[in-house]
Design a protein with these regions (language model features):
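Catalytic cores of soluble, metal-dependent hydrolases
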Residues: 1-67, 90-99, 103-264
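Short, conserved acidic/polar surface loops in the N-terminal third of protein domains
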Residues: 53-56, 78-84
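Long, hydrophobic, well-ordered secondary-structure blocks that form the structural core
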Residues: 68-80
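Short secondary-structure boundary/capping segments
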Residues: 83-86, 189
Length: 264
């Protein structure tokens, strides 16, 4: 690779305005409550690029820091040894190209190690991970660069996570669409063989009038959605769930000039 030539491209990108990483779609909507303010929305193909949107959200210096509530089929927290202070302390998160390159090249390419780095940089107060499996890891902690401790709590029960969420903190909602997939027992756990949950179950979770989303909605300040088609049983399944999410959350206005949350 011609490093000097590539460096020239990075310092002089073609186009106007900022450039988001490939495979990422940026959207803005008013807050679900209708209050003044903006809800930043990021749609990513690979889950680690959600870090890009979490970083941009953190620039707003919201006080108190929101909780990260992540719905996932896998544990994407990562391990302490893979939090590299030298990388993170020197990351210029206001430089979108540098930030995008960091997500691409320095976060785990398996897309399972982006939450601890976010806590190290104090993007969130704590992380609450809702998994779609019977078994769950033990709760953990992560110190940030200022020495403050952040808690990582795991759940596999929606009612329990709703009960445990601190009522006074805003929420950044992160949804990996493979949360709505299940293992195909006839396919020997091959990636791409997953089956989707039934439509009524998916809709009941995502409905803004449903028992899960309704108590959360007024607290949401940001949203990331990871398509992860390889873990959803293919692109068709992933886009099918995205279509349901778009309808239930945004009344089919996602990625249009009139994107807005569905009225309850």
């Amino acid at each position: 690779m011609d490093v000097a030539r590539v460096s020239g491209w990075l310092n002089n990108p073609v186009g106007q305005g900022w450039i988001d990483p490939p495979g990422c779609e940026t959207e803005y909507a008013s807050l679900p409550t209708g209050d003044k303010g903006c809800c930043n929305i990021g749609i990513v193909s690979e889950h680690r690029f959600a870090f890009y949107y979490w970083a941009l959200q953190s620039i707003e210096a919201r006080t108190p820091r929101p909780i990260l509530l992540s719905l996932d089929s896998h544990d994407d927290v990562g391990v302490p040894d893979e939090v590299v202070p030298d990388d993170l302390d020197n990351l210029r998160i206001r430089d979108r190209i540098e930030l995008g390159l960091f997500c691409w090249l320095r976060l785990r390419s398996l897309n399972d190690g982006h939450i601890r780095p976010a806590l190290y940089l104090n993007f969130f107060s704590d992380a609450y991970i809702l998994l779609n499996k019977d078994e769950k890891p033990s709760d953990e902690q992560q110190r940030d660069r200022a020495g403050l401790t952040h808690t990582i709590k795991y759940y596999n029960d929606m009612d329990r996570v709703l009960k445990d969420l601190p009522p006074h903190l805003p929420i950044f909602l992160d949804i990996d669409l493979d949360f709505f997939a299940k293992e195909n027992s006839n396919a020997e756990s091959r990636h791409g063989s997953e089956l989707l949950k039934e439509n009524p179950e998916i809709k009941s979770i995502l409905s803004l009038k449903g028992p899960f989303m309704m108590p959360l909605l007024h607290r949401i300040v940001g949203l990331t959605v990871a398509l992860e088609p390889k873990y959803c049983g293919g692109l068709r399944n992933s886009l099918h769930v995205l279509e349901i999410l778009n309808h239930e959350f945004f009344n089919d206005t996602l990625c249009t000039d009139s994107c807005k949350w569905r009225k309850r």
